[in-house]
Amino acid sequence: YTTYKITYECKQSNILDKKTKNKISAFAIYKSKSKWDGSNWESPTNSTDDLVYKDEMIVDYVQDFILIPIDDKGKIINPAPTTLANSNKIKVIDILLSVRSQNIFYKNNKSKTIYSLGKNANKKFNDKFLREQIVVSAHTRNMGL
């Protein structure tokens, strides 16, 4: 069978604000897919496999992206593990993705609070954009750490 590695990266958005001509304060999430050739991960640029690719943008206008490692007792692991041995203690990862609308949504400025997962890093906005938060839990048996 063929083994693939899927990687997600969060990078600064390249979208320019129409008024200021500066980059907007947001990020974009990119997805890459590599193939194991038996000894190394094959670079998508050198691969002949049509199923591999590099840095395909999957969502833009990302305002917040949080990954929280959880152990087998349901407790947040803080600080997050930095070694492979300690990463095996992670059983679930809670993922929060906060995105804003591309265009103005409200007629007038609205005061909004975006709540953070498990931290005191709530953000307040007072503008005309719609914001949504998506929260999922991923079990690490489905991921390679």
Language model regions located:
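Extracytoplasmic beta-strand-rich oligomerization domains located immediately C-terminal to a leader/signal peptide
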Residues: 1-50, 59, 140
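Short linear sequence signals and composition-biased patches located at protein termini or domain-edge surfaces
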Residues: 42-145
